[in-house]
Every structure is written in C-alpha cells, then in structure tokens.
Amino acid sequence: MKFKYLSIPFLSSTLLFSAYASIQSDLRNLIQETTKQDVDVYKVIKTSEGRKNLITSLKKSYEVNPDKTTKLLLDAWKQSAEKGEIDIEKINFPDVGIYATGNDPLKIELKVEYFDMEYQDLNNFSINAKLNYNFNWHGNYSSNGFAAKKGDKHVFDLPLAIKPSSKNQSKTISFITKTGEGVDTEWIEFPVSLSWSLQGKINKVKEILRKSFWKAMILEQILNTQLISLDTCFS
C-alpha cells in the first residue's frame, strides 16, 4: 500500500459533460448568455484545443455571472457523483493518502452512497456526501500496525461535508489549462471548507481503526482552506 504525504489535502472529481445532454445544453446556454458565443459542447470536448477553449469560455462566464456558473459546475459534479463517476480514489487525507499499488494483495471498491447539494450563491451552499470503501484482500498484508489476512473484507464509510471556506474571503474559482510532457490538462478549482471522518461499518473494522495508524482519521477533521478540483475529464 502506498502512503503519500501531502501538505494540502485535495479532493478531486470528474465532470463528464459529454455524458449528460442536459448539462451540455445548460452549459451552451450559459456561455451564449454571458459571452455571446455559441459553443457546441459536444464537439469542442473531443479535442484538446476545444477543451481549452471551453475552459476559457467558462472563465469568461464566471466573470460575468459567477453564481450561475458555479451552480452549473456543481450540478455537473453532483450528476457525476450520483452515477458513481466521481474520482473518489483521489482523495488525499491531511496526513496520509492511501492507495493500492500493483504489489498489494488488495482490491479497493469505491462508490458514492449519496451526494446531496443545496446552493443559493457562492457564500451559501452546502454538500453532504457519503463515500464507501470496500477493501478486499486476496493475500496477507502487514504494515504500520495494520494487518489483514487473505479473504478479509474491510468496509469503511467516509462522510463528507463541504461548504464555503470561512478563511478565504475571495472564494474565487480558478480556471486552469496546462501543457507539459505531451499531456494537455484542464481543470477548475475553488476553495472550500471540508470536514470528514473515517468510520468502520463493523466492530472488527472499528477496532482496526482504533489500533492502527488510521486512528487519527476517526475523529472529525475540519479543514477551512481546501481546494476542490473539478477536473474536466471529458469522454
């Protein structure tokens, strides 16, 4: 298992605009309303240049109507989450991010149990979600006070609460495009306040949490200056 230490926790999600006709239509209407450009979202998301242009158009839309643009992006994120297409494996915890490597006798199954959102404006929105982790062990494993045997199954819940950052007064969204090493990437990120806790679903798993290096994750973590990355991973 890989332990990745980070200075800034980061929550990543995927916006699959191409998968939802309603989001595509709303996005096209928003860009036309705010920038006077008619962008065929279905076509532009198929190329790197088109995706960059879409990010640029969204940035302009945000400058004209930040509340409406933010609401549309969060709606797209919510739809992705409800279909289990959120990149929840990219959650990096405050002290340690946990990833399965190719050498670990482990298969991690991840799903979104629910993703509820209320939105009024940039200063008044809330997201409450619950993520489920199933660790299925097909071999013995031991590290840092954590041990598992072949055939073990550990089930964890991770409730999340997200709201506007109380320590970031600007609350501005960043629209970013980057090219490097032959890979073009585009993403959207904004500051939030994030709280979460890791919970075992049965007594055995709860005991593992209490006795291993994961014990620090049982208590509710409240992080006031975090970034959510809404990756524009178009299909």
UniProtKB/Swiss-Prot annotation:
Keywords: Signal. The keyword Signal applies. Residues 1-18 form the signal peptide. Pfam families: Lipoprotein_3. Belongs to the MG439/MG440 family. This is Uncharacterized protein MPN_012.
